[in-house]
């Protein structure tokens, strides 16, 4: 085995034959790489790629070039034509091709000869497209039909890019013709007629020809303008008629420009926000909602409402509601559960130290079930409306309050009858002897009211009254005692008026629009009562009105004990037969 000692910038080392061969190859390769090349350097593998700038990301260059290449000439031409108001139309032309050989298929027998060849190579097909834009034509060629379109669009772009953009002007108060390219002639006729307030009428004037080849003539009239159109169908004839009359409508003078006045929207002023726990908060708010909001602001349990009792006659129910807030409880009464619940909430607000909200006239006064504020000394006289038998709804109202009773809230006045306010009562002839100029009247006698109520109840339920018979026997001048029960309410009321010494007066009205009689009754008791009845005849009207008065008189003792009434004006109820 031969050994060679090689020294290359390193200490000498003994190498074997195979190691010498590898070492020689490595030494020979090092000088070659360091020798500069005098000839032109060959292109590297990445020579064809663009040199990227380190400052710009490669993705931006790629996206910019891709975006530039994605916009084809046809897309650019479409955008330019929209600005110019022109429509490009592409028309394909038959591609050009030379005559080709039959490829030896013309041999008889249909067999190929032993030697066959193509006489010449087949040239590629060239597609042609003709582009027309606004009267100008451009021809494009390409290997594909799309390439031919791009060629024609590129030629059109070179010429159309130099044309100025047209100014959009309104013609005859209408949109320009370019804007109406996508609108049918019939739509344009209706638009012009609508702006000029002209009537439009399409009518088929005549039709001719055999059933399978009919010809229609349609006549259109737009105000004073008339046009006719002919076609093989009604639709085509209607369109042609619209085209004919549209030419006349375009000659009309332009409409005057009218400036529309923009409506002024008044901004609502923001109310002053008060804390929900302050006593002044909630003036005018429903007491039920106000009480719930106060409890929510305090972060306490919401109020609990409970129905305690129901009392009174079926038509004169009185409900008692109880509300509980923490350790406090309050009650409220009313003709229905809603009113009782509201009154209970008001009483609870007073217990908690909040001001009771003033009643808002959300409903007509005669139908309102709420009371006006409590009268203060020196403020003058107050009038509050309430229902008969409703009692003291608030439980905290002053006993000196004066009340006036309208007709029942769940009933309505018939046609021709006015509410019994003092002025109306005076107009229909109600006795005004009890009303002085200062609207004062002596308070009713509670004992007499109790006797009257007792007699009325006896007459209502039995037809006879032992109490009245005893009074008549003691008072010789009062009259005779009737024999047998009284069945009609009018007779019972007449008998009661003779016993107690008050007057009853009936006033009859003509038939209303429902062919019914209406009668008005005036009772001069203390307090005076007014009612009316409706029926098929006068007698039934009198009975119904008298029945209402008797029912009120039967409850006088309850009203006198629960709530004294010293106010002016008669009490009024209504009834229907």
UniProtKB/Swiss-Prot annotation:
Residues 34-44 have a biased composition (Polar residues). The modification Omega-N-methylarginine is found at residue 115. The modification Asymmetric dimethylarginine is found at residues 108, 115. InterPro entries: DRBM-containing_protein (IPR051740), dsRBD_dom (IPR014720), STAU1_DSRM_3 (IPR044475), Staufen_C (IPR032478). It is found in: Cytoplasm; Rough endoplasmic reticulum. CDD domains: DSRM_STAU1_rpt2, DSRM_STAU1_rpt3, DSRM_STAU1_rpt4, DSRM_STAU1_rpt5. GO terms for biological process: anterograde dendritic transport of messenger ribonucleoprotein complex; cellular response to oxidative stress; germ cell development; intracellular mRNA localization; lncRNA-mediated post-transcriptional gene silencing; modification of postsynaptic structure; positive regulation by virus of viral protein levels in host cell; positive regulation of long-term synaptic potentiation. Residues 34-55, 360-397 are annotated as: Disordered. One of the DRDB could be involved in RER binding. The C-terminal contains the tubulin binding domain (TBD). Binds double-stranded RNA (regardless of the sequence) and tubulin. May play a role in specific positioning of mRNAs at given sites in the cell by cross-linking cytoskeletal and RNA components, and in stimulating their translation at the site. This is Double-stranded RNA-binding protein Staufen homolog 1.
């Amino acid at each position: 085995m031969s050994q060679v000692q090689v020294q290359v910038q390193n200490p000498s080392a003994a190498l074997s034959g195979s190691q010498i061969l590898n070492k020689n190859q490595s030494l020979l390769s090092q000088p070659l790489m360091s020798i500069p090349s005098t000839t032109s350097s060959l292109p590297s593998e990445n020579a064809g790629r663009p040199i990227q700038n380190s400052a710009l990301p490669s993705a931006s260059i790629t996206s910019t070039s891709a975006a530039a290449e994605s916009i084809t000439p046809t897309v650019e031409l479409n955008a330019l034509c929209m600005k110019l108001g022109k429509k490009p139309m592409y028309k394909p032309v038959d591609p050009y091709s030379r005559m080709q050989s039959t490829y030896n298929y013309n041999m008889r027998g249909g067999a190929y000869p032993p030697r066959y060849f193509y006489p010449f190579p087949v040239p590629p097909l060239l597609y042609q497209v003709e582009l027309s834009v606004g009267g100008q034509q451009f021809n494009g060629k390409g290997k594909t039909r799309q390439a031919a379109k791009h060629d024609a669009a590129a030629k059109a772009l070179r010429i159309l890019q130099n044309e100025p953009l047209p100014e959009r002007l309104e013609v005859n108060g209408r949109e320009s013709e370019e804007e109406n390219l996508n609108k049918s002639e019939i739509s344009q006729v209706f638009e012009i007629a609508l702006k000029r307030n002209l009537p439009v009428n399409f009518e088929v004037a005549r039709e001719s020809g055999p059933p399978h080849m009919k010809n229609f003539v349609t006549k259109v009239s737009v105000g004073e303008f008339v046009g006719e159109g002919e076609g093989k169908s009604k639709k085509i004839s209607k369109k042609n008629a619209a085209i004919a009359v549209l030419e006349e409508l375009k000659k009309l003078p332009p409409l005057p420009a009218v400036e529309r006045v923009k409506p002024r929207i008044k901004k609502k002023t923001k109310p002053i926000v008060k804390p929900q726990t302050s006593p002044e908060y909630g003036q005018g708010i429903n007491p039920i909602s106000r009480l719930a909001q106060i409890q929510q602001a305090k972060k306490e349990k919401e109020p609990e409402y409970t129905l305690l009792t129901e009392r009174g006659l079926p038509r004169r129910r009185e409900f008692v509601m109880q509300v509980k807030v923490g350790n406090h409880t309050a009650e409220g009464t009313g003709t229905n559960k809603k009113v009782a619940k509201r009154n209970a909430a008001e009483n609870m607000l007073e217990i908690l130290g909040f001001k009771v909200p003033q009643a808002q006239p959300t409903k007509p006064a005669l139908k309102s079930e709420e009371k006006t504020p409590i009268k203060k000394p020196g403020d003058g006289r107050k009038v509050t409306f309430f229902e008969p038998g409703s009692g003291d709804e608030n439980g905290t109202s002053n006993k000196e309050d004066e009340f006036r009773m309208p007709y029942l809230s769940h009933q309505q006045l018939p046609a021709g009858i006015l509410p019994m306010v003092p002025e109306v009562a005076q107009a229909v002839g109600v006795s005004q002897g009890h009303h002085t100029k200062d609207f004062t009247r002596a308070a009713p006698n509670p004992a007499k009211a109790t006797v009257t109520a007792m007699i009325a109840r006896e007459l209502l339920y039995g037809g006879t009254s032992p109490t009245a018979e005893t009074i008549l026997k003691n008072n010789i001048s009062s009259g005779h005692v009737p024999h047998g029960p009284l069945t009609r309410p009018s007779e019972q009321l007449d008998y009661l008026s003779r016993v107690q010494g008050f007057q009853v007066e009936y006033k009859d009205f003509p038939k209303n629009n429902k062919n019914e009689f209406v009668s008005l009754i005036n009772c001069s008791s203390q307090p005076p009562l007014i009612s009316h009845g409706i029926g098929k005849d006068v007698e039934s009207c009198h009975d119904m009105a008298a029945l209402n008065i008797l029912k009120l008189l039967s409850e006088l003792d309850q009203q006198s004990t629960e709530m004294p009434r010293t106010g002016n004006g008669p009490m009024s109820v209504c009834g229907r037969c």
